[in-house]
Each structure stands twice: as structure tokens, then as C-alpha cells.
Amino acid sequence: MPVPMLTRRKAVGMLAERLTGLYDPCEARSIARQAAAFYAGITLPALLADPEAEIDAPELEQAAERLAAGEPLQYVLGESEFFGRRFAVRKGVLIPRPETEELAALVVRRERGRAPRLLDIGTGSGCLA
């Protein structure tokens, strides 16, 4: 007998519940939504627009286990966004931080029209380079 599929809402709720011990409820729900959208191969707005649609994401259970063990979402997904671009990340590669994105935006604004010489030390994911 085939196993019934979950709705997007139920999948997000179940994953968020597993993460609530590690994160506050709002953060747990945000992580759950991002993971569900990623593994369903849809955008976050698409996930939210039709929460009663069935979700076909067999990898989500394994992702849930990794997330519940405290592994960062970016490592579980294998990617992280920086300045609207996706960069591959895995254990051993630093995850691009929002603060670094803000710093890079500040430098770009301040140095516009000039030819600065910059040095990126400890590159990590290479998103600044």
C-alpha cells in the first residue's frame, strides 16, 4: 500500500517541531520552510502560496535528521546565498555571513568609481573573491 504524501503545511510543521529544541519557534519554522522548499524543488513563495499541496521530497527526512543534530541549514542544503548568488558550501567551508554581505556592500558603495586594491584573507567559500 503506498504511503500517503504530506501536505507542505504538515511537512513544515513536523520539521519545525523537531527543530524547536535547538532554535526558537520562529527560527525553527523559517529553517523548516527553507528546507522543504529546497527539497521540493520550489521557491519559498510557491511553498507558502499553496500550503495544502502535497510535497514530494523523500530527502527531507534525512535533512531533518541532520538539522535536528545541529548541522547548519547551509551545509545540509550544500549551498548558501550571498549577494543574490548561490555558492557551494560543505563542512570545512565557511558559510557566508550576512554581516560579511553588509560589509561588502559598504565597500562597494564607498569605493564606487575608484580602483581600490583589496585583499581577501581567509576566503572560506570564495564569495568575496
Regions found by a protein language model. Give the residues of each.
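N-terminal auxiliary segments of SAM/dcSAM-dependent transferases
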Residues: 2-77
